[in-house]
Amino acid sequence: MQAAARAGADAIGLVFYPPSPRCLSVDWARQLASEVPPFVSTVALFVNPAAAEVYTVLERVRPAMLQFHGEDSAVFCAQFGVPYLKACRVKPDVDLLEYLRPFSGAAGWLLDSHVEEYGGVGESFDWSLVPAERSHPLVVSGGLSSENVATAVRRVRPWAVDVSSGVESSKGIKDPAKVAAFISEVRNADV
């Protein structure tokens, strides 16, 4: 986390999805969040959570933003009174704007790969499926690494990018050199 902040990350994701090797306990996440430097945000990531779980994280970890993957409704996502990103798993037969329309209260929309499991599997999606017309800031995720993120930024022109497995040395373990290379590629492409 410190390596990401030093390299220039704008936000640090804290995963609260038990099947993920990146999942954090609330206590560990609270400790990590307390070490995040000023001007770097924390984002709590959930997949189909119970409301009580989200409230616990909000109370104890105090993330700046929530990120919802899964089948959560717009009403569910908005009930916490905290800015949130709604994720959409992209595939050719999904009308992204139609899928995301109910989430007009979201701070932004995160576009991710449509794969069997959630999160950090290293597969990208066809960026040509991203609509040119947008009503919300877009975050691109899914299969990004230092090798392809510059292309994604140039093609999609997202508000932000989100990375996990693309900067890991092994599942759940971030590699500081890969993190720095990724952020450098993003900055070089975003001109």
Feature annotation, model-predicted:
Residues 1-191:
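Conserved N-terminal beta1-alpha1 strand-loop-helix module at the mouth
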